[in-house]
């Protein structure tokens, strides 16, 4: 439930789809497990997991959704060994070289044979549609996984006019200014971790962890032309995170004190607790993202 990463996208047009319409659109693209011959399957699943009953969970016009992906695990080395063995057998029996086209066909046959016996793994990715921010927040550290989710959502809705979040001023410039100044603007507070990178290929990368970032050793790297591309920060007393120069947010962690705000709800009704946690997280993410946009903005104008 609690998001751990943020890959952010903003709408080019207001998102006006209501919960019922969104639910119906996703219903045509629900997840189903791999059959014996499927390499992978991908689709929408219950937003609140096994406790939930809907593909979309909405509160205060914020929409939570989830995609599930199942992939068969076929190690490349296993396929290669089987292919090499089969090719060697044919070449010995028929006294000729096997062509590339034949190898491709044999490889497909081997894959088809092995698929029913292959193990599979499942992963889930959540996204939060937030019309009040005109944004979609994807809980993933991988841009590829985020784009997969958006592609399926676009297919379900027919269109999805979103672009990756970016700012007019490079984030690394802003982070570097903060480190040089020795502080981040409220409500943010710098922590003890940063990554500095040179614009030139020869300049290299320097990482600092559990270190006072205002020390001369750190500032000396900035003096030689390096810029801050990752910086650990706190947002008030509620969120710790790692801000990255590509506008993605990693290692998002809500504090125990903040999460305890729903302790009075209890855990006797798991669905009620999930709903309360979703409302609490959603409200804080609105404040958080607004503060991030204000600190790093203005937004880069879309073409």
From Swiss-Prot:
Any Pfam family hit: RdgC
Domain of life according to the entry: Bacteria
Keyword tRNA-binding: no
Any one GO cellular component localisation term in the record: cytoplasm
One GO molecular-function entry: double-stranded DNA binding
Record's keyword annotation contains Cytoplasm: yes
Main location: cytoplasm
Similarity remark: Belongs to the RdgC family.
Matching PANTHER family: RECOMBINATION-ASSOCIATED PROTEIN RDGC
Purpose: May be involved in recombination.
Name this polypeptide is given: Recombination-associated protein RdgC
Annotated source species: Shewanella frigidimarina (strain NCIMB 400)
Taxonomic classification: Bacteria, Pseudomonadati, Pseudomonadota, Gammaproteobacteria, Alteromonadales
Gene field: rdgC
